[in-house]
Amino acid sequence: MMSKGPAVGIDLGTTFSCVGVFQHGKVEIIANDQGNRTTPSYVAFTDTERLIGDAAKNQVAMNPTNTVFDAKRLIGRRFDDRAVQDDIKHWAFKVINAGGKPKIEVEYRGETKCFSAEEISSMVLLKMKETAEAYLGKKVSDTVISVPAYFNDSQRQATKDAGTISGLNVLRIINEPTAAAIAYGLDKKVERERNVLIFDLGGGTFDVSILSIEDGIFEVKSTAGDTHLGGEDFDSRLVNHFVEEFKRKHKGKDLTTNKRAVRRLRTACERAKRTLSSSAQANIEIDSLLEGIDFYTSITRARFEELCSDLFRSTLDPVEKALRDAKLDKGAVHEIVLVGGSTRIPKVQKLLQDFFNGRELNKSINPDEAVAYGAAVQAAILTGDKSEAVQDLLLLDVAPLSLGLETAGGVMTALIKRNTTIPTKQTQTFTTYSDNQPGVLIQVYEGERAMKRDNNLLGKFELSGIPPGPRGVPQIEVTFDIDANGILNVSAVDKSTGKQNKITITRDKGRLSKEEIERMVNDAEKFKQEDEKQRDRVAAKNGLESYAFSMKSTVEDEKVKEKIGESDRRRIMEKCEETVKWLDGNQQAEKEEYEHRQKELESVCNPIIAKMYQEAGGVGGIPGGIPGGGMPGGTPGGGIPAGMAGGMSGDPSSGGRGPTIEEVD
């Protein structure tokens, strides 16, 4: 039995993975059994065995349908995600729909097997674990695994699950750019604050993070990215280009009908792409590619840049967004650090350099190993390493997307805003929407838009057994708690009974596609006006409804009945009932209509209530509004609803007739 070894850091990449360990005061990146410091994230199944890493990638042309890679592009996503559907076109292995989740179907030892992306990733992690154990001569269980900073909740949870499946104890999920920043900043004694932009373009994902580094404190200011952009996409552009060229040269023969031919072409394209980072031209020579035809061709760097120009240019959008969110202009960034193999592409470097007005880019860290390096440092810190190098290191990371829940009117009320430092915990009190409501449905969303329908539903749960009471009286305390992995726990407690329910948002929901994330965040700017208009409309509607109910309950109060004439009381009741009836039939009216109706209602109610006060001589004792917040409170000692107190009109986080809950200040 091997003794227990130190904790390791693993960079689980889309195309390559890497493992490092911090010992004797420094990080060592560990080479695998082939002597390579990075291992392909490939798993192959044959009639006799399972191969992982180099061995799997080396036989891919002979066995394309049973060699699985790019699992990171499936992890935590739904089958019908557009990105997944686009990717399936490029893969030789079969992806099937298993209850909305993508599963990979392969032939293994003469049987058909299905694997989830988590299982495939766990096999790659297992290879990294064994690589570390062979080097250390000890058993490895504790690890820190990296994920793209822009990975959402489902993807983080799924990655953690993959670690668990492979028999690892996942101490922490760390964001890749943050890990790379540690690799950049660990040995630098930064006395005064420096703003560092990490530009991390890998095989399948792209992240930009801005950190301030000072005295061993690494604080993430903002993060942005695209979980579906990387070297694989550049390879695909080359493959498509040569498939067309082959058709032209050989009487319309279509390579895509032969999976092995496409795989051989893809391998050649990846090699050519790498060559083009240092040469102006690359040659492709593949013998007997299809039906005995040899394919000899070449491609220039200029042509490659043209084929990928839109993809290369799109890397600047997250840079702009990260700067905006961090409230920094270009000049305030001290260092631009390149991470990820795809940052070796000269055009990508040139675009970034031009964006920063010709500033020199920082290439001081190894782009393939930096993330594993940082993860290894974090693993050492979490296991209490006393080494001087990591003694005073502090990491402050952020949540990439806003998190909240649905409140009345389909509005998303954010409890945690994007780029909030994690871990974090936010609690807010909500109340019921209708009288004697027995339970509330708590629906948790992630995204930047005002209305829940434009955001991503992460999960939902019911809090039942609320004692019967008028609307607005029960108080339900909802807590959002994001741990240091960026994974969300939500709990709800009914304050009167102490009844509690909680949910860890797990991966039952897939995740947003690149299109959706872009639509949510970038378009949020364009949609802002619409969002605000909708919020105001819902707030006006809630305001009117609340005012009507409040007035009704005020004049039904025994103490008020004594002080008000029956005819006046009936007038108020009838007008309130008429208003509520109108509201039921006009859920989608404009803000102005609701405001007009409220003025009408006030013109009936206010004189009567004011007269009652004068007669009562302003003496107290007339109830004010309904207890429990979210309802109008009265003037001192009186029953005139004062505006719409407690999360009502003008409060963007209140909403219209929602299914369940409404906000309380």
From Swiss-Prot:
Residue ranges with Gly residues bias: 629-658
Pfam families: HSP70 (PF00012)
Organism: Echinococcus granulosus (Hydatid tapeworm)
Protein name: Heat shock cognate 70 kDa protein
Highest taxon above the source species: Eukaryota
Spans annotated as Disordered: 629-665
Protein family: Belongs to the heat shock protein 70 family.
Key words of the record: ATP-binding, Nucleotide-binding, Stress response
Entry annotated with the keyword ATP-binding: yes
Annotated InterPro entries: ATPase_NBD (IPR043129), Heat_shock_70_CS (IPR018181), HSP70_C_sf (IPR029048), HSP70_peptide-bd_sf (IPR029047), Hsp_70_fam (IPR013126)
GO MF annotation list: ATP binding; ATP-dependent protein folding chaperone
Coiled-coil regions, chain positions: none
Gene3D superfamilies (UniProt xref): 1.20.1270.10, 3.30.30.30, 3.30.420.40, Actin, Chain A, domain 4, Substrate Binding Domain Of DNAk, Chain A, domain 1
